[in-house]
Structure formats: structure tokens, C-alpha cells
């Protein structure tokens, strides 16, 4: 049975006030004492009385999320995986989410209401766009926040956790180029989101280093579903000069692309190579595809947990985190990538000389 505050204090040989201040992040409690208290909390299963803490500290012990309701976002399994990481960390620290659905055009007003309500101590934002106005707005509201991703243009002095998307797709494209591929297709996420912009940039950079250009006809942007991956791949394969390799911004897109490739009677890794970005979705493991996928790997759940840890640490004055974190994706080579196939035309037969 979990202990109460008095029992926890007696166990530690500290006053209830000291234990309470350690739990609430007061700076006058030294690091050693705070560490002892937190360790005892983990061992005993102690849960603080949040109602009493709110009265004592003025904190809500809640993280705010403005939930986008634009088409294709609310049902996105990638967003769900990110939220799962956030939720796991929040539960660990007995924090809550305050979810506020909002259409894109109402987002600013929703954030303002959330900040004014006092129901949250901090917020996070995701689905970053170029020159994203939300960063300056949150700064003006003076509410703590962390960004999942980065904007392009605008201010640079804001806290974020992001994946090096340019570097990830540069590495992937360079591998394909080293294998002899020069017609590389891209099945990407929504065109206006910065992770998609940066992934395309990585591919363009790798091609340019070898004097090659990206064929715009071999690029498709969409919501990241298997059906969109299927349709995009079908379209590419019907072209007069189809790609010999394809980059997919998600294993979900790759699932559809693989279906189209199989229906066309092509062999993955031989007739066409495929690399996908792996967000480490538990229900879709790249090694379990019929042909194991080469991937760039970075966990969405880990990113969600990290952002929650940073927000909670800031609220409780615990932990020392870098302002900006750019994670490198790991390139994992499997069987879906191989040398470019020889698609050169057959030579014309030599004319016969003379006759019988």
C-alpha cells in the first residue's frame, strides 16, 4: 500500500516541508536531498495529493496539447505513437494532458485560451511549417513550450527536439547512388511540413554531389498512409522511365509501395530498391516485411517521452537539458537495397553484309 507524505518524511528522516519542497522543485532543496526523495518515491510508490499541491504551488501539473483536427492528422498513427511516448512519461510523474481540439485557422485563439485558463503549466507543438507563427505567439504568451521538429525561417532561439531529416535522407540517397541508382523516386509526407521539406533537401543534396538532378515527376507528397504509398508507386512504375529506387518517408507508405511493386511482378532489392524511414512503430517492423527493408531509424515514441521529460523537468525545476536537440537517424541496411538493374536498351542487330 502506498505511503502518505508523513510516512515518506519519517522514512527519510526529513521534515514533511522539506519532502514537499523537493517534490515541487523548490530550488533551495539541494540536489542530493532531492535525489534521495525521488528515489524513495520510486521505491514506495508514493503519489502526491495533486489538489493540495495545486493550492500550495499554483501549478496545474498538466501539459497542454492543441489537437489538430485537419484531415489526415487526427487518425495518423505516427502522431499516436508520439503521444504514447508523451503519455508514458506523464504517467510516470503523475502529470495530466489537457487536450484542446482545434481547426488550423483557430489554433492561435485556442493557445491563447489555454494559456489564460491556468489549466496547464506548459505546452508542446508539432507538425511544424515554414515560418511557423506559433513560435513567436507562444513566446509572447510567456508559457513554457518545447517544439517537436523545427521551423524553416523565422526565429531560431526556441527549444526543440528534432530528427536530422536532411541528414537521414542524404545518407539513404547516397547509399542508393553508391549502388548505381540515378533515377530515385520520393514518396514523401505533406509538402508544407518541414520534415518533408528537409527530407527532399537531403535527397537533392546527395544527387547534386554526383551531378544528378531530382526528377519532379518522381516526387509525390501526401498523407502518410499505405494507400497513398500504393498509388504513388503505381504512378511511378507506369512512367516511360520508371525509377530504379524509391525513398519512402514512412514504413506505412512503404507498405503500400511494396504492394504496388509486387503487383507489377518486380523483385524488391533486385529490380527496384526501397528505403523507408522507420519511426519504430510497434505494429509495423521493417525486418518483418516480405523483403526486410533498409531504413533510416528514429523512434517517435522516444521523442515524445523526451519532450514530456523536458517539459515536466522545467515545471518542477528538475534536470538540466540542452535547449535544442537534433537526433541523428540510424541507417540500417537490409535486403531491400541492391545494385541498380541494367535497363540499357538492347543493341540493334548488325545488318547482314552480302547474300547467298
UniProtKB/Swiss-Prot annotation:
It comes from Rhizobium meliloti (strain 1021) (Ensifer meliloti). Keywords: DNA-binding, Transcription, Transcription regulation. This is HTH-type transcriptional regulator AglR. The keyword Manganese does not apply. Residues 1-57 form the HTH lacI-type domain. Residues 337-356 are annotated as: Disordered. The keyword Transcription regulation applies. Residues 5-24 bind DNA. Pfam families: LacI (PF00356), Peripla_BP_3 (PF13377). Probable regulatory protein for the binding-protein-dependent transport system for alpha-glucosides such as sucrose, maltose and trehalose. Gene3D superfamilies: 3.40.50.2300, lambda repressor-like DNA-binding domains.
Amino acid at each position: 500500500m502506498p505511503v502518505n507524505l508523513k510516512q515518506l518524511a519519517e522514512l527519510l528522516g526529513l521534515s514533511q516541508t522539506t519532502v514537499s519542497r523537493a517534490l515541487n522543485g523548490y530550488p533551495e532543496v539541494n540536489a542530493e536531498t532531492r535525489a534521495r526523495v525521488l528515489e524513495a518515491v520510486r521505491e514506495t510508490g508514493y503519489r502526491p495529493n495533486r489538489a493540495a499541491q495545486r493550492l500550495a504551488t499554483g501549478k496545474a501539473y498538466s501539459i497542454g496539447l492543441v489537437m489538430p483536427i485537419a484531415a489526415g492528422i487526427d487518425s495518423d498513427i505516427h502522431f499516436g505513437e508520439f503521444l504514447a511516448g508523451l503519455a508514458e512519461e506523464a504517467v510516470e510523474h503523475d502529470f495530466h494532458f489537457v487536450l484542446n481540439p482545434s481547426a488550423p485557422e483557430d489554433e492561435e485563439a485556442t493557445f491563447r485560451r489555454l494559456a489564460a485558463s491556468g489549466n496547464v503549466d506548459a505546452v508542446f507543438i508539432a507538425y511544424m511549417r515554414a515560418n511557423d507563427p506559433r513560435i513567436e505567439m507562444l513566446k509572447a504568451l510567456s508559457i513554457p513550450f518545447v517544439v517537436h521538429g523545427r521551423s524553416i525561417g523565422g526565429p531560431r532561439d526556441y527549444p526543440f527536439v528534432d530528427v536530422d531529416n536532411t541528414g537521414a535522407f542524404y545518407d539513404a540517397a547516397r547509399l542508393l547512388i553508391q549502388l548505381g541508382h540515378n533515377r530515385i523516386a520520393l514518396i514523401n509526407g505533406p509538402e508544407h511540413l518541414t520534415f518533408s521539406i528537409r527530407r527532399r533537401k537531403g535527397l537533392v543534396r546527395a544527387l547534386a554531389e554526383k551531378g544528378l538532378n531530382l526528377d519532379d515527376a518522381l516526387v509525390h507528397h501526401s498523407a502518410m498512409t499505405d494507400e497513398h504509398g500504393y498509388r504513388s508507386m503505381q504512378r511511378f512504375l507506369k512512367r516511360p522511365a520508371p525509377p530504379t529506387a524509391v525513398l519512402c518517408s514512412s514504413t506505412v507508405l512503404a507498405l503500400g509501395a511494396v504492394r504496388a511493386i509486387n503487383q507489377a511482378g518486380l523483385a524488391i532489392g533486385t529490380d527496384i530498391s526501397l528505403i523507408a524511414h522507420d519511426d519504430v512503430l510497434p505494429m509495423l517492423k521493417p525486418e518483418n516485411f516480405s523483403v526486410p527493408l533498409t531504413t533510416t531509424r528514429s523512434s517517435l515514441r522516444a521523442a515524445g517521452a523526451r519532450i514530456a521529460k523536458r517539459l515536466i523537468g522545467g515545471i518542477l525545476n528538475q534536470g538540466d537539458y540542452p535547449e535544442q536537440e537534433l537526433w541523428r537517424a540510424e541507417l540500417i541496411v537490409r535486403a531491400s537495397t541492391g545494385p541498380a538493374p541494367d535497363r540499357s536498351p538492347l543493341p540493334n542487330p548488325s545488318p547482314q553484309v552480302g547474300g547467298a
